[in-house]
Design a protein with these regions (language model features):
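Mature catalytic core of soluble alpha/beta enzymes
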Residues: 2-8, 16-227
Length: 227
């Protein structure tokens, strides 16, 4: 059984618990599914069951259509193919945030690594036999791109952007902001391992997050957790 199949089964089982009431206490509504080539799990504590599947799906679709490299028609995919230079608010904010992190890390973090990740077969790309790394490195550099007046400027049109390292965290923030507008104050959001928590869980305690132990052979999510 591969990891994707395992995740699907786990998600299906977890979805059964949606809207479960914990004794005489509050209700915890659960929402699970797939987005951006990964999974998401959301828990919301409230006085009664919440039916927000369509709203959450709409938010996730909006982000997917903007930043997902797994979606060939997303705005980011089109930017990488130079079919447009217009950016939306999601991409502009992620590029600004990424640049700040790149500057703080002296360039150790860099979202322009897409030519390299593509050459080695990440995000669904076909690996290149014996890639010319030196040539590809000339297309990498966070200071070679900028957003000006809603448009992406590249020093070289062959440059490409990979937001996978930041997109899922931004998605969690986006959903959290939506909950805040609705007055929802206690929830846990996890998108592709990027987590946003607020308030307490149904037992009145801080949310507890399990992380797969990083050891060889631990391929099944949830099989060996460290808390």
């Amino acid at each position: 059984m591969n990891i994707r199949t395992t995740l699907y089964i786990m998600t299906a089982l977890l979805a059964v618990s949606c809207g479960r009431k914990t004794g005489d206490g509050p209700t915890v509504s659960r929402f699970d599914g797939f987005t951006q080539g990964t999974t998401y799990h959301i828990l919301v504590k409230s006085d009664g069951p919440l039916h927000m599947e369509n709203e959450i799906d709409s938010l996730l679709t909006e982000v997917d259509n903007s930043m997902s490299l797994y979606n060939p028609q997303s705005l980011l995919s089109r930017l990488n193919r130079n079919e447009t230079d217009s950016v939306d608010g999601f991409i502009a904010e992620c590029i600004r945030t990424a640049r700040r992190i790149s500057e703080q890390s002296d360039g150790a973090y860099d979202i322009t690594v897409k030519p390299l990740t593509a050459a080695y077969g990440f995000t669904g790309d076909v690996p290149v036999q014996n890639p010319d790394v030196d040539s590809l490195l000339k297309l990498v550099g966070y200071d070679k791109i900028a957003v000006e007046n809603g448009r992406l400027r590249k020093a070289d049109p062959r440059m490409q952007i990979d937001l996978n390292s930041i997109a899922q965290g931004a998605t969690s923030d986006y959903i959290a902001a939506y909950f805040e507008k609705l007055g929802i104050e206690e929830y846990m959001i996890e998108v592709g391992g990027e987590i946003f928590c607020r308030g307490l869980n149904a037992k009145g305690k801080p949310w507890v997050v399990g992380i797969d132990r990083p050891k060889e052979g631990n391929f099944t999510p949830g099989a060996d957790l460290q808390v």
